[in-house]
């Protein structure tokens, strides 16, 4: 590898540390504390401490290092990852009988993310600010207001973008991980026998000694791997190799050292279970550590917020959510977006969660069920891709599937015990999002079917207009067309009421493919239907934003002369009324909310 390539890899790896690992990197704030908090009847005694440490270590190895970094990240769609991407890959070569099942599983996984995203910022920030109570117990009543204040500021700056502060994420998170390592190593040196927990025999002894209780305790152990989906979801931003390098060189060693450092502290002083993370530090370092922890949790929250923006955009592009306003906060980076309605719904939800649960330990009961549910679904979809798309041998896929579920299912089952103590929250939010996505997709499908069944066929209508032409006016008219073989409703409406047509008519259809990017060579397909009618189909990936100037440029390059200032745009607001369904008034063609429509709104004529 050349020197320049090494420098580029180092830079991207550092950036990945700042974005990808924020959630899983702040888990040491609360994981071991929740494992030994007494909620499972397990005290901070040596067998339990070493057992939990062994479980945490081997979960990091098996789930993160093996499952996600070694297997799941192989499944990319032009370099992109994430649960909806995995769903698209799984359905490409699946049998028609299984395709609807795989789509439902993918949508459930995406819905789980919406459920968990409300908890992550609240849990992370509260865990950091709770360090105040160690410095001055009298400050304990201010933890909730301060947590709300920090998150209010974070959500308020979203509309301005995070390009400037984003440059600080990597050095702050690198400092955070180095601090984790130093604090943990300092404690391990004082009590090195804690390293015995690297032996998986301690995990087996833990199950043997605590039996049924140990199973439910897995619900707390799983807190160590929350955020693991970010490794796969952010693959398109940073690439596989930088994410893997960051994990094995920086993140994994730092996490292991810190967890084992907390364990060494607890072996010497079980009373430190009140907050083992902050008690690792000397008293003089508590305030700097509190500030650093707060910054790290804010960065972790930012990564989650950006993730939900990206997932929402992908769902909108793929037709699973209504078109909504998406603001690009950076002219250079297309991935930096802001969705106002999602931002403020998420903010209100997070504030309600903080004020309702009041302490991170209470919130921990709601944490993990959506993460483990997504892990199970990821395993199913990945094995489907391996079998149907990569044609791995059946015996190999079956063995891998059994191995993955042997880890994922117990973790998910252990978290089901949290349903009545807070786990209902992410499940309820996920159920709402799943209902919205499936209802929207279903109604959109029915609208397309109605348009095909009852709309005027394109070719006969054009032939009739050419044979008996109405009055023509100078210029070009672009009619947005949802269905390529049907005359747009806006054109019929214009012809009926105005009795005229422009001298050139372009029927434009925007098509979103299930890939992140479409090559420019395939961007525009032009077909001349008659001397005055053209059909243009513009294809985009779900990560791209339709651009009318670009479409016109491609049309000009292929011989169809188009000038923006001499063109009028017509759109129809179509809706399907479902009288017996709760979302009866849903409008399925909110053109004004689409990015392309926003760019041409000043020259458009909404009709119908």
Swiss-Prot record:
Keywords: Cell inner membrane, Cell membrane, Ion transport, Membrane, Potassium, Potassium transport, Symport, Transmembrane, Transmembrane helix, Transport
Record bears the keyword Metal-binding: no
Compartments, record wording: Cell inner membrane
Primary localization: membrane
Coiled-coil stretches: none
Membrane spanning residue stretches: 9-29, 46-66, 99-119, 137-157, 165-185, 213-233, 247-267, 285-305, 337-357, 363-383, 396-416, 419-439
Annotated membrane topology: Multi-pass membrane protein
Gene Ontology CC annotations of this record: plasma membrane
GO terms for MF: potassium ion transmembrane transporter activity; symporter activity
Database matches in Pfam families: K_trans, K_trans_C
Known catalytic reactions: K(+)(in) + H(+)(in) = K(+)(out) + H(+)(out)
InterPro entries: K+_transporter, K_trans_C, K_trans_N, Kup
Superkingdom, taxonomy of origin: Bacteria
Record function comment: Transport of potassium into the cell. Likely operates as a K(+):H(+) symporter.
Family: Belongs to the HAK/KUP transporter (TC 2.A.72) family.
Name of this chain's protein: Probable potassium transport system protein Kup
Source species: Aeromonas salmonicida (strain A449)
Lineage: Bacteria, Pseudomonadati, Pseudomonadota, Gammaproteobacteria, Aeromonadales
Gene behind the chain: kup
């Amino acid at each position: 590898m050349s020197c320049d390539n090494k420098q580029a890899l180092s830079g991207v790896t550092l950036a990945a540390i700042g974005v990808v690992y924020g959630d899983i990197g702040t888990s040491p704030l609360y994981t071991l504390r929740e494992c030994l908090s007494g909620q499972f009847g397990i005290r901070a005694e040596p067998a339990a401490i070493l057992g939990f440490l062994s479980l945490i270590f081997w979960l990091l190895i098996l789930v993160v290092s093996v499952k996600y970094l070694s297997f799941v990240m192989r499944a990319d769609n032009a370099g992109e990852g994430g649960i909806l991407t995995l769903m698209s890959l799984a359905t490409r070569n699946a049998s028609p009988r299984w395709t609807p099942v795989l789509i439902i599983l993918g949508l459930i996984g995406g819905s789980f993310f919406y459920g968990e995203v409300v908890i992550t910022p609240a849990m992370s920030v509260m865990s950091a600010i709770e360090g105040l109570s160690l410095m001055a117990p009298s400050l304990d009543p201010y933890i909730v207001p301060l947590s709300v204040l920090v998150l209010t500021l974070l959500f308020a700056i979203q509309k301005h973008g995070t390009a400037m502060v984003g440059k600080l994420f990597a050095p702050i998170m690198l400092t955070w991980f180095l601090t984790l390592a130093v604090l943990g190593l300092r404690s391990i040196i004082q009590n090195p026998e804690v390293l015995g927990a690297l032996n998986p025999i301690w995990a087996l002894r833990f199950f043997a000694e605590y039996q049924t209780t140990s199973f439910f305790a897995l619900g707390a152990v799983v807190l160590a791997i929350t955020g693991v989906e970010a490794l796969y979801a952010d693959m398109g931003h940073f690439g596989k190799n930088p994410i893997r390098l960051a994990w094995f060189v920086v993140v994994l060693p730092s996490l292991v050292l810190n967890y084992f450092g907390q364990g060494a502290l607890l072996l010497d002083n079980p009373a430190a279970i009140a907050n083992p993370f902050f008690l690792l530090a000397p008293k003089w370092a508590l305030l700097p550590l509190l500030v650093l922890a707060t910054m790290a949790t804010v960065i972790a929250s930012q990564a989650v917020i950006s993730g939900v923006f990206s997932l929402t955009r992908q769902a909108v592009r793929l037709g699973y959510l209504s078109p909504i306003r998406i603001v690009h906060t950076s002219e250079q980076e297309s991935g930096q977006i802001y969705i106002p309605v999602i931002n403020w719904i998420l903010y209100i939800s997070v504030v309600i969660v903080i004020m309702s649960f009041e302490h991170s330990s209470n919130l921990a009961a709601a944490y993990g069920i959506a993460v483990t549910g997504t892990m199970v679904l990821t395993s199913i979809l990945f094995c489907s891709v391996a079998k149907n798309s990569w044609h791995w041998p059946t015996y190999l896929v079956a063995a891998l599937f059994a191995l993955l579920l042997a880890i994922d299912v117990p973790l998910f089952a252990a978290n089901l015990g949290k349903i009545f103590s807070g786990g209902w929250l992410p499940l309820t939010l996920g159920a709402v999002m799943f209902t919205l996505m499936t209802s929207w997709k279903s109604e959109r499908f029915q609208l397309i079917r109605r348009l095909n069944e009852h709309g005027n066929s394109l070719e006969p209508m054009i032939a009739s207009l050419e044979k008996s032409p109405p009055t023509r006016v100078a210029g070009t008219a672009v009619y947005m067309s949802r269905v390529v073989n049907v005359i747009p409703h806006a054109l019929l409406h214009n012809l009926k009421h105005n009795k005229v047509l422009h001298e050139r008519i372009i029927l434009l259809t925007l098509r979103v493919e299930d890939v992140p990017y479409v090559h420019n060579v395939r961007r525009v397909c032009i077909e001349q239907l008659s001397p005055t009618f053209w059909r243009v189909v513009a294809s985009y990936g779900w990560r791209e934003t339709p651009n009318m100037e670009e479409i016109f440029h491609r049309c000009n390059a292929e011989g169809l002369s188009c000038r923006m200032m001499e063109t009028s745009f017509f759109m129809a607001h179509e809706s399907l009324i479902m009288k017996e369904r709760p979302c009866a008034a849903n409008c399925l063609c909110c053109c004004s909310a689409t990015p392309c429509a926003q760019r041409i709104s000043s020259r458009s004529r909404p009709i119908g």
